[in-house]
């Protein structure tokens, strides 16, 4: 039933101009207070920072216009890197998509995933683990290709970036640097090194369990450390940096803009978890758990549709404000001169906007209770 609803919703929105070419995918974990059904509730890597609880994994796919397309659910011990290719294969079959460009974060990627994407001739824009990927760390970041200044607008503000394209071993990388983040990273590192110097003056033992400090240390003996200037110099290359790998022909700014849109999926997860109360989940059966989570996905679809309709009116409505204003609507039954009437409260401005966008007409302010 879930698949049927998702496919019919997509078909309803689809027209001759609809092309589901750009797909954003991310996953999150949803923890359980109990066992979590017969198979879904398993211990795994917890993005909720609750490794003590059983959990399930939820993936949401969003199109290039920011609209939820479909959701997928797995047991909580499922690794992110195993989910991307099967989901994209199913997506193409279900929605009859010939050409698709996948945008996903670094946690979704492995060497096997990359090989599968290449074998299927799928377009992709993927985040890269710049610290743990040896090729990126040692060759891509140090490549002599020049950085080109870019400006990205976000919430009315201009953010300065610079980017360079590196072609290496048949792969295309885009190295991006956020100048503000680079300055912050440098300042944070200077603060840590200063704190290190103070700690070293007091004694080495306090540093043994501090992984944040030990990144910049070298071991002198079993319990003695010193600041390692080579490690500090190496860290500078990562200041404000993120790296993309893509096989598209998009220019660096276009690729960056696509990748940055992943925040829409992350925002959807936050909305589902908090505004729509996806957690806590107290259901005992897999099928009822799936139904509970799918209701949150449908709420995301409705939220997206309403926001799109409000935008079409040239207006902007805050979701918490919309909910609060709609919640303030009330009716009271009163008796006057032997007759009973229903009196409706006046809608607040944001509620009026939402109702207008949804095409919903309110009943009269005062009406005969008998007629109702």
Tell me what each language-model feature is:
Residues 1-372:
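Anion-binding and metal-coordination hotspots
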């Amino acid at each position: 039933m879930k698949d049927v609803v998702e496919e019919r919703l997509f078909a309803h929105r689809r027209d001759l101009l609809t092309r589901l070419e750009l797909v954003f995918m991310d996953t999150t974990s949803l923890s359980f207070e109990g066992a979590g059904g017969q198979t879904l509730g398993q211990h795994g890597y917890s993005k909720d920072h609750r490794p003590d609880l059983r959990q399930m994994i939820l993936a949401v796919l969003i199109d290039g216009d920011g609209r939820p397309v479909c959701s997928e659910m797995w047991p909580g011990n499922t690794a992110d890197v195993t989910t991307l290719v099967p989901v994209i294969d199913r997506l193409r079959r279900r929605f009859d998509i010939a050409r698709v460009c996948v945008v996903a974060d670094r946690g979704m990627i492995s060497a096997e995933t990359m090989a599968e994407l290449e074998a299927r001739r799928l377009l992709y824009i993927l985040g890269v683990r710049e610290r743990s990927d040896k090729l990126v760390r040692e060759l891509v970041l140090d490549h002599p290709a020049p950085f080109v200044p870019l400006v990205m607008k976000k919430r009315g503000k201009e953010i300065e970036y610079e980017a360079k394209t590196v072609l290496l071993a048949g792969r295309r990388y885009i190295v991006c640097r956020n100048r503000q983040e680079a300055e912050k990273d440098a300042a944070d590192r200077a603060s840590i090194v200063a704190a290190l110097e103070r700690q070293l003056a007091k004694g080495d033992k306090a540093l043994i369990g501090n992984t944040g400090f030990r990144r910049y240390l070298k071991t002198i003996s079993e319990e003695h450390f010193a600041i390692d200037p080579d490690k500090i110099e190496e860290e500078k290359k990562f200041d404000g940096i993120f790296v993309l790998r893509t096989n598209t022909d998009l220019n660096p700014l276009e690729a960056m803009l696509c990748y940055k849109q992943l925040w829409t999926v992350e925002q959807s997860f936050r909305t589902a978890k908090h505004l729509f109360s996806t957690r806590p989940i107290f259901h005992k059966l897999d099928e009822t758990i799936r139904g509970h989570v799918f209701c949150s996905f449908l709420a995301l679809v409705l939220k997206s549709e309403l926001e799109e309709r409000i935008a079409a009116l040239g207006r902007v409505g805050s979701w918490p404000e919309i909910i609060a204003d709609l919640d303030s609507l009330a009716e009271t039954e009163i008796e006057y001169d032997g007759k009973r009437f229903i009196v409706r409260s006046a809608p607040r401005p944001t509620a009026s906007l939402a109702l207008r966008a949804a095409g919903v007409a309110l009943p009269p302010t005062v009406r005969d209770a008998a007629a109702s």
